[in-house]
Amino acid sequence: MKVSKDKSKKGVKSKPKTSRKPLSLKQKLQRESKIVKVDNLNWKAVDIPDNLDDYQGFYGLEEIDGVDVKVTGGNVEFVVKDNSKVKDSDNEEDDDDVHDDDDNQDDGDDDQDDDDVDIEDDEDEIIEGDNEDDFKGFDDDNAINEDDQMDIESAKTEKKSKKEVKPKNEKVAKKDSILESAFKNVDLTLPDDNEVNLPYWDDLSLSSFTLNGLSALEYEKPTAIQKRTIPLAIEGKDVIGKAITGSGKTLAYGIPILERHLQKMAKANQSKKVINPPTGIIFAPTRELAHQVVDHLNRIAKFTPLSQHGIVSITGGLSIQKQERLLSHGPGIVVATPGRFLELLQKDMALVQRLSCTDIVVLDEADRLLQDGHFDEFVKILELFGKHRPRDNKELEWKWQTLVFSATFSRDLFGKLDKHLKSNKNKEEMGSSLIDNDEILQLLNDKLKFKDSKPTLVDANPKEMVAGQITEALVECGPTERDLYLYYFLLLYPGSTLVFANSIDSVKRLAPFLNNLKVPTFSIHSSMIQKQRLRTLERFKEASSKNSTAVLIASDVAARGLDIPNIDHVAHYHLPRSADVYIHRSGRTGRAGKEGVSIMFCSPQESSGPLRKLRKLVANNTKKRTRLNVHNDVKLLPLEMDLVSQIKPRVTLASKLADAERSSSSTRKEDNWVHEAAEELGIDNLSDIDNFEDDFIKRQRKRKENKALTKDEARSLRLELNDLLSKQIRKNSRRSYLTSGLQNLAHQMVTGNTHKDVLGHASVNALDDLRTKKAIKKKQIKTKKVKDKK
């Protein structure tokens, strides 16, 4: 053959070909593919849209397609068939290894001599495959000419040069984006120090950066807790601070940490490539509170030279890889929830050694420590810090500074309200003052192990549990009438309202109930993922700014620390289980000096025991705490039964639709769970499963099935409800003529001096209806004085 002649010319001995078995499909795919490391893949950067406000871990996101993932022995391997998916520098290095492996797999049963023959035959096949596009017939010579070889090599070099240009351009674009984010605040115009006029903050001796931030936020005067704790914290003393909700506790510990960090930045040597430990670590009980603290500190630190990752949050529900990357940048302030923070520490001991060198540890909402079983992770974190904190570092103190803040520090507040209240005269005489409560101080000292032998105690409001600007009210109703009176309150008193319920099931039922009544309603509870919670809070804030009425239904996950602006009312759909929860719930309104309303919907069973115990513990005046008559310090909301009777049909229909929707979704989830479990166990026939169900489960299922509605029934009820909602409610509906009676409804309609949803009713405010005549006169006198001054 000519082929043998050509091979003899090149000095290759011809060998007789042996019979070779055909390649399988798996072997063909293996011949075409190769295993590549993850770093050698040709990743592409993902462009983030400009309208995306919350990135949620999408910084530096890259993607690739056309790559198979294979797991062998616990190791993840990336299999590539197309060389364009691999960086050019790695193509040539990996080709030889892959071909050798394929040949060994194909010819493992043959002798060594046969392997050599097959490899040579494979080389001939590869040469023929490369020239298939240029094939024009049978030539006398099948050998490749030197000119053709030069053309092939030049084409390969051109392809490589084109591929090399692309990643370089991508790297340049990445560098430009990084530089833009790093220097985005360079053009920020700093206010002149001479223009900052904050005389009330002068005694605290703060830096110009912090004063500029306070001036931009228009914080002209420090609150009582800030004025008393900031100087002590700057001096390095351990502080235990107690103040009512909404009194500015975040800045009381945030400003001292910021001042300490600015001093460290001025002394630090920037040339050293060392990851510095954070100046302060702040622990919060909930994820929402941690994100809120970060946002608040970033606004104060707007004019400081902090980097982009100067203040970071470490919470559950978000990407742990992103949080590890944030900590690797060496942030100055870390705000964390104990669970996720402990998880990161247990993964990396080097991180423990670095974070244990922090200067300040803050515990926000520290009263949770006093409850058994809470914050066990926080105690473990302190133990890790104590073991790994270096002792031989002269610049570092032997112990970190500890700052503790909360609105409630009385252990009596954590007891269940439905239990019998044991009267203790000593405790009643002691009052709610933090300074007199030695038991609480001993518990905190045992768990936190302060640096100072006696931490400094600051009680800004010794006689107040609930803020004085919050008006408390009560609605006495039956257990099944809560929906009716809740809708009555929301209809008559427009504004942003936060409704608290004791169970997640109630939260899930109330949201569709109010939405059926055309009330803009959102819900948040602990079973939602973190992104859903944050998104719900943003939507509620947006709706409350646009609409006159917006409602957020929440479980106790939103009771602590959340600073949602402009909350007019807090409604307790259920009476809270403990007094501390009531204090924190009510503290969501009446913040930053504004007034608010906290209203309870209470059944007769609750008013006889739990409500009485709550009022004894929470009453503002400690001398009057032992009074048995609850109504003396809680005002009853005035009810107009004419309006209640008119809205009752609406509420009944909306409640039926909400119950049907809730029952159908719950039964659907139960059925799906049963079918999935049956498939895993290999059970095909589920007809006999009812025989094995418990009687209680059967009754519960029947109760849900009775509430369920067919599509036609639900459609007819919804049409009937929409018809009722289209008709406007009218005050004194028995009147036959608009112009009859003492009030001229026609004149009110023409002049616009009427309620938005209730015809013939003046536009009212819950605060005005709950105030006494004396309080109304005082307010009128104050408004007149302000007008006269102007």
Swiss-Prot record:
MF GO annotations: ATP binding; ATP hydrolysis activity; RNA binding; RNA helicase activity
Which GO biological process categories is it annotated with? rRNA processing
Where is it localised? Nucleus, Nucleolus
Q: Where is this region: Disordered?
A: 1-29, 80-149
Which InterPro entries does this UniProt record tie to the protein? DEAD/DEAH_box_helicase_dom, DEAD_box_RNA_helicase, Helicase_ATP-bd, Helicase_C-like, P-loop_NTPase, RNA-helicase_DEAD-box_CS, RNA_helicase_DEAD_Q_motif
Under which EC number(s) is this enzyme classified?
A: 3.6.4.13
Q: Which reaction does it catalyse?
A: ATP + H2O = ADP + phosphate + H(+)
| Sequence motif DEAD box, location on chain | 364-367
Q: Which UniProt keywords apply?
A: ATP-binding, Helicase, Hydrolase, Nucleotide-binding, Nucleus, Ribosome biogenesis, RNA-binding, rRNA processing
* Free-text note on domains in this protein's UniProt record: The Q motif is unique to and characteristic of the DEAD box family of RNA helicases and controls ATP binding and hydrolysis.
The job of this chain, per UniProt, is described as: ATP-binding RNA helicase involved in the biogenesis of 60S ribosomal subunits and is required for the normal formation of 25S and 5.8S rRNAs.
Q: What is this protein called?
A: ATP-dependent RNA helicase MAK5
| Underlying gene | MAK5
